[in-house]
Each structure stands twice: as C-alpha cells, then as structure tokens.
C-alpha cells in the first residue's frame, strides 16, 4: 500500500538549505514510498545494500544558496545610527532639537557652547543675507511695495532678521571679538545689509530701519574706540584709514545717520596727521566697494 505524502514546510523568511537545493535543481526529492521502504531495512541488509551500491561523488551545494543564507541571516530590523538620523533632519528641526536638549541640562549647554566653532564673518553674513532675502520674498506679487499692506506682510520676517543681526552684532564687538579687523569687516558688510532694508511710505514704518542705523552707529563708535586703545597712536599705520573711506560712504547711503562714528574716526585720524593719499581715487574705490 502507498504511504501518505509528507507535506513540505517553508515558512516565510525561514531559509532551509536542503529545500533551497531542491528548488534550484541540485538533487531531486525522494519519493515517500521509497523513503519509507529504506527506513524498514534492517542494519544487516542495509550494510549489504551499501556494499553493492556504486560509490558516488559527494553532492556540491550551490554557492548562491550559501550567499543567500548569509544575506538573509544578516538582514535584521534595527534603528538608524545617530549620524544617519541627524542627517535626515532639516536645519530648523535640528536647531530646535539641540536647543531643547540644552535647555534640559545646563552641563550639556555649556559643553555645546565650548565645542561649537565660532562663526566667521563670512558664515554670519550668509545667515543674515538669507534672513533678509526671506523678508523680501514675502512682498506681494503686485501692487505697491511701500504701503502698509506690504509692510505688515514683511514685518515678521524683518523683525527676525533684525533679531539675528543684533545677536551677531554683539558677538563681533570687542572684547568678545578679539580681532578688531574682524569687527570692522563685520560692521562693513552688516551696514550694507541695512541699506538694503525696504523703505516705506509711512514714516512710522521706517522706524525699524532708523533704529537699526542708530545701533550700527554705536557699534562703529565702539570698534573705533577699541582700535584707538590697541593701536596706541598708530591708527594711520594699521590700515584703519581704509575703514574711514568705507564709513564715509556708509554714512552717505544712510542719510547721514552714521555721523557720530564717522566724526569720531575722522578726528582720531586727523590727530595723527592722517590724510587720504588721493581723495578722488578713494571715492572711486569706495564706489566699487559699496554696491548695495
């Protein structure tokens, strides 16, 4: 009588090497009745049967099966490494996450402040330029760009730009900034950004820009005074005269709103006998430097 067929079991993702060999054709399945008859043979008969059976080469397993087994066993569910996880976040989300962690632990906050590289003048200006560009992007497509409607659309982004400008301005002032040349360089480029701020038809709306000029004027004054202390009477020899040319042009573009710092720097250089080598050449050079 024929024996019953034994069903094959192959659950999902459970790799069985012998089953894989059968599927790939490396060995045919043994019929159930032949398998059952072999199991009933006595040990003596089995030895006799093996003596008469011709020897055969050992069956080779496919390297593909071995490779698939290794890959399947190495594929495991696991979370992303921290570097991959953080790289998937946009800058705003990453900053918010880091600020939240620092707010919960003062030691972590101090450590982050210690290990984070200080911004350069170039990197700071990149941030500020993007912030001002975002404000200009909020202008209405059509209509008057100087009326109250346009102002209230742009105002939140302008205030964010001014908040960032205030933070960076404080950072680049001495004594926090130890290099006076960096302070002058930042002020030069930051003042150019202030020139770009929108001009409104309403005087009340223009107060934002006017107040910003007032802060910039104070900053120029502080840096000029610090430069005078450090150079000890050698301002003309230290290249500060070049900043006078820039400040003169900035004052012109601002509508004479930087006159306090300009007069201070001019008086300090005059006391040391500084005179521009060629006023007309200096003016032309400043024209090229101040494209705003």
From Swiss-Prot:
GO terms for cellular component: cytoplasm; nucleus. Coiled coil: none annotated. Residues 24-68 are annotated as: Disordered. Residues 46-56 have a biased composition (Basic and acidic residues). InterPro entries: Cut8/Sts1_fam, Cut8/Sts1_sf. GO terms for biological process: nuclear protein quality control by the ubiquitin-proteasome system; proteasome localization; protein transport. GO terms for molecular function: proteasome binding. Its main location: cytoplasm. Belongs to the cut8/STS1 family. Involved in ubiquitin-mediated protein degradation. Regulatory factor in the ubiquitin/proteasome pathway that controls the turnover of proteasome substrates. Targets proteasomes to the nucleus and facilitates the degradation of nuclear proteins. PANTHER family: FI02826P (PTHR28032:SF1). Binds the proteasome. This is Tethering factor for nuclear proteasome STS1. The lineage of its organism: Eukaryota, Fungi, Dikarya, Ascomycota, Saccharomycotina.
């Amino acid at each position: 009588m024929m024996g019953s067929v034994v069903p094959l079991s192959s659950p999902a993702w459970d790799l069985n090497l012998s089953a894989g060999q059968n599927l790939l054709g490396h060995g045919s399945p043994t019929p159930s009745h032949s398998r059952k008859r072999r199991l009933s043979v006595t040990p003596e008969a089995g030895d006799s049967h093996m003596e008469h059976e011709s020897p055969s080469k050992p069956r080779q397993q496919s390297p593909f099966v071995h490779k698939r087994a290794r890959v399947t066993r190495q594929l495991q569910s696991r979370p992303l490494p921290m570097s991959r996880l953080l790289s998937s976040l946009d800058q705003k989300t990453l900053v918010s996450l880091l600020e939240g962690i620092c707010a919960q632990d003062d030691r972590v906050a101090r450590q982050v402040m210690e290990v984070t590289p200080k911004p350069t003048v170039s990197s700071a200006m990149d941030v500020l330029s993007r912030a001002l560009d975002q404000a200009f992007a909020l202008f209405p497509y059509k209509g008057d760009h100087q009326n109250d409607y346009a102002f209230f659309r742009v105002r939140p982004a302008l205030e964010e730009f001014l908040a960032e400008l205030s933070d960076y301005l404080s950072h680049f002032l001495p004594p926090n900034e130890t290099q006076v040349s960096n302070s002058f360089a930042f002020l030069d480029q930051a003042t150019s950004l202030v020139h770009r701020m929108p001009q409104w038809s309403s005087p009340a709306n223009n107060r934002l820009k006017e107040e910003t000029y007032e802060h910039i004027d104070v900053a120029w004054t502080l840096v000029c005074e610090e430069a005078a202390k450090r150079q000890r009477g050698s301002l003309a020899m230290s290249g500060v005269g070049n900043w006078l040319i820039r400040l003169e042009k900035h004052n012109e573009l601002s509508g004479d709103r930087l006159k306090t710092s300009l007069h201070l720097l001019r008086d300090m250089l005059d006391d040391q006998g500084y005179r521009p080598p060629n006023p007309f050449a200096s003016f032309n050079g400043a024209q090229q430097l101040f494209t705003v």
